[in-house]
Amino acid sequence: MHIAIIGAAGMVGRKLTQRLVKDGALGGKPIEKFTLIDVFQPEAPAGFSGAVDARAADMSAPGEAEQLVEVRPDVIFHLAAIVSGEAELDFDKGYRINLDGTRYLFDAIRLAHGKDGYKPRVVFTSSIAVFGAPLPYPIPDEFHTTPLTSYGTQKAICELLLSDYSRR
């Protein structure tokens, strides 16, 4: 199995990579290759004997999503994002990274699927920020999104995009 992790140099990306290396498999299938991407150079995981392509790349840059999709990972973990505070301070950067980068990835997958049926499993990390406040506990699946920040809005839009692209 070939696994790609976008946002691999971040805390969650590093922990996910370590856990996958420790487990050695995902869904009962052995992991043979990692493609690790982040705007900062990700480190190759210690203790992994398979192939690793670790590279610095900005998924909101033209062509980057297509390059990832060309290597046909079986599973793509999309963890990359500009967090709430930074997305509020730099409106354009928040939308470029959080929305455009995600849309480029989904569109590259859609186009590849149209060519040869490529259909990876995509795991997208959202945020509690999509719900706004106040929140019930626990938050039920059908709870409506009412984001109060640009970051929450961007994540909510990406959830809708994922749902729409998944139908295609």
Name what the model sees in each region.
Residues 1-26:
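N-terminal Rossmann NAD(P)H-binding glycine-rich loop of SDR-like oxidoreductase domains
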Residues 6, 37, 76-80, 122-128:
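SDR active-site strand-loop-helix element
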Residues 48-61:
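Rossmann-fold cofactor-recognition segment
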Residues 59-97:
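NAD(P)H-binding glycine-rich loop region in Rossmannoid oxidoreductase-like domains
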Residues 93-104, 145, 153-154:
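Glycine-rich NAD(P)-binding loop of the Rossmann-fold in SDR/ketoreductase-type enzymes
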Residues 103-149:
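Conserved Rossmann-fold NAD(P)-dependent oxidoreductase catalytic core, especially the SDR/UDP-sugar
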Residues 133-135, 148-168:
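Active-site Tyr-X1-5-Lys
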